[in-house]
């Protein structure tokens, strides 16, 4: 493992450095008269990209034969605040009527393909019903996360009381749009030991920071470094779909980074940061100067410290290779999952159809108790038991026993011995900030990096985002919190980038997360730590419910299964700054207005 541009180490050094395709100019042409952008390989030498490797850019104004136009409805067919999916021959379009105006957009969320017509329309944007991403209905732009791409916006005209939509056939089929981005024009890119922006960590926060800089017109050098051997990938899928291959998880193809001049250093470990000289040092000794620094190192999974911890086939899930190996070894074997949090339960659910047996060991009385409460936790536990998962609650692992070096049994403190060929440990994580201890960058007692609303650390020019930070949560009276959610990391990465450019942006996102188990999705919005009551509407046994988490007189979080789009609705209300009172929820449940959420907007029913 090593840093960037270092001397060759044939076995250990693996670097993925992707450089920009420079603007064509006379001084940049090769002897053949063709532009010759270069990329550094693992040994520090340069190679030329061939013409066929270049990205093709579609013409921004499609010819008439590439477009389709049709009348999709009468002007009176939609009321203000309504949405409808309409067919346009080559694909569907989301038609929206808001404040008397019609808007036509892509109909699927670019994140995971949710039908936006089932989402929430509010304040000039539509919020995805599945994961909470928000899109501006006037532009199609992504305004809140998760996800990277925006929606296509189509032309609308009114003639003789009919609504016509015109769209390119290609846009109808793609259903996603990458924002216009700058390219790197820095003459030193790839040749210098300095960079304008260095991003440590290539998860959601790091990638969104880099993309936001380019979207805002930043054309200087950006270096993104990661401990992973892969380009940025969809990490939440690791525990939900363990046999997904790395190339299927990629958030952007290699050509994307090349096109927009975002250099990616893989398997590059930062060991020290010197804020006085603005230099970072990599494990192989290479030093890189920066002007602005984003720290997004993420977290490291906790491991077991019991007797026998060195036996083989005991895993944490941190990389695609970890996940792939677990599912390969688990087929037809006995699996023990330690920890009944989101990661552990997702892994257990996924392996039930592949393993001979799946057992879960947990210190609490019920899964998710601290996060979702006793009643919801028990309902989910029953769902797992109905799918042949065995639980060992209120105990922990005291010993891992092996045979010929490989795991054979898990011994619990309750004295129970559980057969196990594979053990997956999901007992939480700690911030991966050890390399910052002597840097002068502030860390709290748990190792998290405290930041302000603008994602700034205590050191000027140094920002932090993602799982390793604590930040003030605006709608919870700026309470300092750590929220290791995929969606939150996206938002923090964008705010950090905006403030690198002195835009004075602040974090205002409402946390939104989701999990999937046995084909059922649970959605959650808000920040429920410290809740003192849970109000449930629906049927827990049927797993069709919404749970409101309250503290005092205020709703601070909501969770649901088979009750869409109520979580997105609540998230939108909280994002607007309006508090939801406990009494409102109690009346909602009392009158059993199942599915009716008009009370949230104050419109009545």
From Swiss-Prot:
Keywords carried by this UniProt record: 2Fe-2S, Apoptosis, Electron transport, FAD, Flavoprotein, Iron, Iron-sulfur, Metal-binding, Mitochondrion, Oxidoreductase, Transport
Domain of life according to the entry: Eukaryota
Annotated ranges, domain Rieske: 70-165
Family to which the UniProt record says this protein belongs: Belongs to the FAD-dependent oxidoreductase family.
Location relative to the cell: Mitochondrion
Span list, region Disordered: 22-45
Gene it is expressed from: AIFM3
Keyword Nucleotide-binding: no
Residues binding FAD, per UniProt: 201-205, 235, 240, 270, 467, 514
GO molecular function annotations of the record: 2 iron, 2 sulfur cluster binding; metal ion binding; oxidoreductase activity, acting on NAD(P)H
Domain notes: The Rieske domain induces apoptosis.
CC per GO annotation: cytoplasm; cytosol; endoplasmic reticulum; mitochondrial inner membrane; mitochondrion
UniProt-recorded name of the protein: Apoptosis-inducing factor 3
